[in-house]
């Protein structure tokens, strides 16, 4: 995120971080959401950046919706990811941040009232570039693109799939 923070992007970054924290600390879903809402979302008075790990301008409803849905639907999301991942990359082998990012992206792709698939893919690709310098962003793009075509084929009707 450059100088101008995009609130929906900030919400997605926070959701990835919250999913990571919940998995690593084995904290309850609601405890993690409450911690983020109280201590991590929104800028401190007189500051407008990401000081002290805060995420300014995040939309709390979108953040909460992604975290709740990704956690509650993990038993549906994980098999989708396992199928989309290369065989040599089991879900458990992935970096925990990458796993959280893919779960959040897959969760949004499953939301029928969510943004168009290309928006979801681009948002999480941008987030992946913020966390990773290697091949992970390409992996995110490929996996989320495959899931988008599987979950919302009507939005890709008439396109040839590149291979």
UniProtKB/Swiss-Prot annotation:
Transmembrane regions: none
Single biological process term from Gene Ontology: transcription antitermination
SUPFAM superfamilies, per the entry: NusB-like (SSF48013)
Transcription regulation listed as a keyword: yes
Stored InterPro entries: NusB-like_sf (IPR035926), NusB_fam (IPR011605), NusB_RsmB_TIM44 (IPR006027)
Record keywords, A-Z: RNA-binding, Transcription, Transcription antitermination, Transcription regulation
GO molecular function, one term: RNA binding
Any one of the GO CC terms: cytosol
Stretches of the chain forming a coiled coil according to its record: none
Job of this protein: Involved in transcription antitermination. Required for transcription of ribosomal RNA (rRNA) genes. Binds specifically to the boxA antiterminator sequence of the ribosomal RNA (rrn) operons.
Family statement: Belongs to the NusB family.
NCBIfam families, per database record: nusB
Protein's name according to its UniProt entry: Transcription antitermination protein NusB
